[in-house]
Structure formats: structure tokens, C-alpha cells
């Protein structure tokens, strides 16, 4: 679990390190606030995304299932700044084995709630779906703005990073992959 006391002590030291007075009125409760925030935004560190999976059997359904524009936020593990965007999750069931739609969003949420790389986030989501229901194929496309590119360094506000994780037939069959990307892009 998260050690709130260590987080509070570290935040206090950070404030001192940047030249702030952690005992001034506006900062007095900041260490506690940050510790509580960490408990929430890093909750995925202590959750198994497979624990939310619920599998249904829908006779002979082998057509694409897509949930688009799932809002996401995560924390870039390089700078501990947020990246915010959307995830699109697509899978093609095998022999009618399907997953509840809300479970796709829950998997994304759990995996995003930890220090993360966008590339790994999509890959981990795809792997959980593959391992849970063994579909014919999975695609996870993540579009996000990274505040480490907006607030520091290159300072390119509004730029988006797009990553994809493809598995099964969606990776190996060009026509299927093109259909998935067209659906994601609204064409």
C-alpha cells in the first residue's frame, strides 16, 4: 500500500528544496493533500486489472467490439507529470466470448493509475484482454497530451502522442487493421 507518511515527508523536503517555506499558510496542508492524491492517482499499483473482467458467452459473435474515447489520465514515470487523453479499445471475439463494455474502461483506468509510459499502457491493456478472453485480435490506441512536453523542455502545448498496441488478427491482417483504424478515426 501507499506510505502516506513517507510521501508527506518527501513533499515537505521538496518544498524546502525549491526554496519554499512548508510552514506558511498556503503550504501547511500540502504534504497531506499530495499524499491523499497519490493514494487516488496511483491506485492501479495495488489492483489487478483482471479482477474486474466479467466474461459472457454470446453465441457465434465474432464481429468487432469497440469502445472509443475512454477518458484517461496517467502520470509519466519520467517526470511525474500527467498525460491526459483518450483510449480506444477494439477486440474481435473468438467463439462468442465477450467482455462487458464497462470492463474495458475499468481495465484502462486501473492500468493508467500508476507511474506509466503511454506505450506500455496500451500494451498492458491489450495483454489483459488477450489473456482474459483470448479474442481473435485486439487493438488499443491511446492519444494523449503529455504535460512534460507542455510545461517544460520543448513546451509544445496541444501536441498529442498517439500509440497503438495490436494483437492477433488486427496486427497480422492489413485489411482488418485498416478497418479498425478507419473506425477509430471515424471514417
From Swiss-Prot:
Report whether Chloroplast shows up as a keyword of the record. no
Reactions listed under catalytic activity: GTP + H2O = 7,8-dihydroneopterin 3'-triphosphate + formate + H(+)
Highest taxon listed in the record's lineage? Bacteria
Q: Which GO terms describe its molecular function?
A: GTP binding; GTP cyclohydrolase I activity; zinc ion binding
Q: Which Pfam families match?
A: GTP_cyclohydroI
Gene3D superfamilies with a match to the protein in the record: 1.10.286.10, 3.30.1130.10
SUPFAM superfamilies for the chain: Tetrahydrobiopterin biosynthesis enzymes-like (SSF55620)
Single GO BP term: one-carbon metabolic process
Question: What enzyme category does the UniProt record give?
Answer: hydrolase
The family database entries (InterPro entries) matched by this protein are listed as: GTP-CH-I_C/QueF (IPR043133), GTP-CH-I_N (IPR043134), GTP_CycHdrlase_I (IPR001474), GTP_CycHdrlase_I_CS (IPR018234), GTP_CycHdrlase_I_dom (IPR020602)
Swiss-Prot/TrEMBL keywords: GTP-binding, Hydrolase, Metal-binding, Nucleotide-binding, One-carbon metabolism, Zinc
Q: Where does Zn(2+) bind?
A: 76, 79, 148
Q: In which pathway does it act?
A: Cofactor biosynthesis; 7,8-dihydroneopterin triphosphate biosynthesis; 7,8-dihydroneopterin triphosphate from GTP: step 1/1
Relate the assembly described in the record.
Toroid-shaped homodecamer, composed of two pentamers of five dimers.
Family statement drawn from the similarity comment of this UniProt entry: Belongs to the GTP cyclohydrolase I family.
Q: Which PANTHER family match?
A: GTP CYCLOHYDROLASE 1, GTP CYCLOHYDROLASE I
* Name of the molecule in the record: GTP cyclohydrolase 1
Q: Which organism is it from?
A: Acetivibrio thermocellus (strain ATCC 27405 / DSM 1237 / JCM 9322 / NBRC 103400 / NCIMB 10682 / NRRL B-4536 / VPI 7372)
Amino acid at each position: 500500500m501507499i506510505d502516506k507518511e513517507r510521501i508527506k515527508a518527501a513533499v515537505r523536503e521538496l518544498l524546502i528544496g525549491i526554496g519554499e517555506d512548508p510552514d506558511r499558510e498556503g503550504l501547511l496542508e500540502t504534504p497531506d493533500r499530495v499524499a491523499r492524491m497519490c493514494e487516488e492517482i496511483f491506485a492501479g499499483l495495488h489492483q489487478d486489472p483482471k479482477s474486474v473482467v466479467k466474461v459472457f458467452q454470446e453465441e457465434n459473435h465474432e464481429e468487432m467490439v469497440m469502445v472509443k474515447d475512454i477518458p484517461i489520465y496517467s502520470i509519466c514515470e519520467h517526470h511525474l507529470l500527467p498525460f491526459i487523453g483518450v483510449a480506444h479499445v477494439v477486440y474481435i471475439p473468438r467463439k462468442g466470448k465477450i467482455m462487458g463494455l464497462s470492463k474495458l474502461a475499468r481495465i484502462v483506468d486501473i492500468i493508467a493509475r500508476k507511474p506509466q509510459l503511454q506505450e506500455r499502457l496500451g500494451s498492458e491493456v491489450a495483454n489483459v484482454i488477450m489473456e482474459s478472453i483470448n479474442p481473435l485480435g485486439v487493438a488499443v490506441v491511446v492519444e494523449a497530451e503529455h504535460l512534460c512536453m507542455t510545461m517544460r523542455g520543448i513546451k509544445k502545448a496541444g501536441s498529442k502522442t498517439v500509440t497503438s498496441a495490436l494483437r492477433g488478427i488486427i496486427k497480422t491482417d492489413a485489411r482488418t487493421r485498416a478497418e479498425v483504424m478507419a473506425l477509430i478515426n471515424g471514417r
